[in-house]
């Protein structure tokens, strides 16, 4: 394994209820394929929700998650700290009002974690 192959990126996908499955899939699949083509895990990811419970996408498919917001706050202080956070949302995003999520996103950003949005995730980032 060379030095380049030891560099790993950890990505958190924060799933908002009614998130766009197609936006999520088109973000995560290239990471999976890159790992396969490289022959090592250059990218790892976890799915997060506010409470750690499954989140239903806009197509009614329910996705299990790996962590809650509380878990992510703890991870920020440890080696599980992500390189990036993507907010995955979709329809009805203007109804999403969660001060804990907004504060957590600011914490991530202030600690040097790249933060971005998928589909209408930019709407949440602008809040």
Annotate each predicted stretch with a short phrase.
Residues 1-115, 124-127:
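Extended, subdomain-level signal for the structured scaffold at the beginning of enzyme domains
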């Amino acid at each position: 394994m060379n030095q380049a192959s030891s560099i790993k990126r950890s990505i958190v996908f924060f799933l908002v209820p009614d998130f766009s499955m197609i936006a999520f899939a088109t973000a995560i699949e290239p990471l999976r394929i890159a790992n396969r083509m490289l022959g090592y895990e250059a990218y790892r990811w976890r799915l997060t929700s506010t409470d750690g419970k499954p989140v239903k996408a806009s197509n009614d498919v329910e996705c299990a998650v790996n962590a809650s917001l509380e878990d992510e706050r703890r991870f920020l202080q440890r080696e599980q700290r992500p390189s990036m956070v993507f907010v995955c949302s979709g329809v009805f995003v203007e109804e999403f009002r969660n001060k804990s999520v907004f504060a957590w996103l600011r914490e991530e950003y202030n600690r040097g974690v790249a933060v971005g949005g998928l589909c209408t995730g930019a709407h949440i980032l602008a809040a």
